[in-house]
């Protein structure tokens, strides 16, 4: 979940 959130923020 944490990794996904980060990815979303970067995107």
Swiss-Prot record:
GO terms for molecular function: serine-type peptidase activity. Its EC number is 3.4.21.-. The keyword Transmembrane does not apply. One of its GO terms (biological process) is regulation of defense response to virus. Keywords: Antiviral protein, Hydrolase, Protease, Serine protease. Thermostable. Optimum temperature is 40-50 degrees Celsius. Stable up to 60 degrees Celsius and retains 60% of activity at 4 degrees Celsius. It comes from the Eukaryota. It is an enzyme of class 3 (hydrolase). Optimum pH is 9.5. Active from pH 7.0 to 10.0. Serine protease which has antiviral activity against cucumber mosaic virus and tobacco mosaic virus. This is Antiviral serine protease. It comes from Eisenia fetida (Red wiggler worm).
């Amino acid at each position: 979940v944490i990794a996904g959130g980060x990815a979303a923020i970067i995107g």
